[in-house]
Amino acid sequence: MKKIIVGILLLLMAISPIYGASGFAITYGETTNSNSNMKNTVMTYFNSHTDKQLSDATTKVITASEVNAISKNITGRYYSSNQIFSCAMVDLSYNQGIKIVVDKSKINVVTSKMYANALKSSGIEKGYVVVTAPVSSSGEAALAGVLESYELAVGADIPENVKKAATEELYTETQIANQTGQNPDKIADLFEQVKNEAQKQNLQDPAQIKVIVINIAANLNINLTDAQAQQIADAIANSQQVQGDLTAFKQQLNDITGQLAQNGGILDQIMNYLQMAFDYISGLITGQ
């Protein structure tokens, strides 16, 4: 029996480091958070897409000022406090890369592939992400909440210049999709392929990246104007130029996801030890 208790204590000590970061976070747009009906709608959607208790999540309210600080010089849009509806949930215990669920009944512009591109530019390729809103929304401003959710879950900040580069990339994607009339996911594929090639060649020069944009767009049968090709190249170049600032965040992300994965196995061992303890005590009671 003593060995069983010691085993449980050792396993509990092994999992204790993960509590420096939650691994599970939710952000609510301030408009949604201030309206109980709207917030309940969002929570119902989140509950239907996770087996975890929402009360266990680290939560934060995303304000208009936070969104504007990142996006206003990129999009030219200024959001008021009654316009921030989008909400995001991030769970880092998901261990199969990244999975993004977008509530298509509410988020009507930005797709899961577009969010995936922006997150990759932010050093994020792991986790389970859910994005929704209580009313129809473009989803562009939601990126601020998604990134904030990752910061809460990871326990580390994403540099502001990285957030701005990711926001510019997402906004450019939506603009190009709108201007060309192409399927948004096809434009997201274009961005993904260009980024992959730019990363492969370690390119940061917009002129060099523009050549890649033109070639890949032609392969995908996407007709771009010279200005559009330049706009895409500039956005991806900006993303490439800030990747060096992500070292600390990416290390922390890898650490917490690794700890969570290890924790899953350790919890199984704890349950086994508890079962052994239960069986031992039951045996004493029954005299067997």
Label the predicted regions.
Residues 21-122:
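N-terminal Sec/ER secretory leader and immediately downstream segment
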Residues 50-56, 126-129, 158-160, 206, ...:
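Short, surface-exposed acidic
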Residues 1-20, 274-277, 281:
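Sec-dependent N-terminal signal peptides of Gram-positive bacterial secreted proteins and lipoproteins
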Residues 120, 128-220:
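Soluble oligomerization/assembly scaffold segments of membrane-associated complexes
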Residues 72-73, 147-151, 172-183, 221-227, ...:
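Short, charged low-complexity intrinsically disordered segments located at boundaries
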Residues 13, 41-50, 118-119, 150, ...:
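Hydrophobic, Leu/Ile/Phe/Ala-enriched alpha-helical segments that form helix-helix packing faces
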Residues 187-288:
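C-terminal interaction module
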